[in-house]
């Protein structure tokens, strides 16, 4: 439906930017290292499968599904560009966010696969891997309640 609306309003897609991304508190840990785990804290063993699934659906399927929808136009034209937003976490994962790091690694790997898959179709596929941005979503992972950086 989205593809049809875009095609109707804007025409064929020449450049696709897959920028979906995010995390979920149920897919994070409270401590950087296992030996630091405290009673009542969330450890690796407490990761919620639904939270991890949410993170993978948002990040990986948020790249896969738009590519399936919009790359068809590029294949027909034998031209196009797909830019996926990965993360430096794909290459050097931060602690406490295992699902996000793994999902972005999947995006990076998928990007490499797509680049080969569409090479002879005239479609260029690349990814960018920005560093870390502080947001309300991740502030609690980086800062103490008093605003100082966690050490």
Show which residues each predicted segment covers.
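Catalytic Tyr-X3-Lys loop
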Residues: 14, 35-64, 79, 83, ...
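A glycine/serine/threonine-rich, flexible loop-to-helix segment
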Residues: 29-35, 40-41, 120, 132-151
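Alpha-helical segment proximal to the catalytic Tyr-Lys
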Residues: 72, 116-117
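Active-site loop-to-helix junction immediately N-terminal to the catalytic Tyr of the SDR YXXXK motif
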Residues: 93-101, 113, 141
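Residue(s) in the substrate-gating loop at a strand-loop-helix junction
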Residues: 87
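Conserved mid-core segment of classical short-chain dehydrogenase/reductases
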Residues: 23-53, 76, 96-99, 139
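Active-site helix of classical SDR
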Residues: 67, 103
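Conserved amphipathic alpha-helix within the SDR
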Residues: 1-11
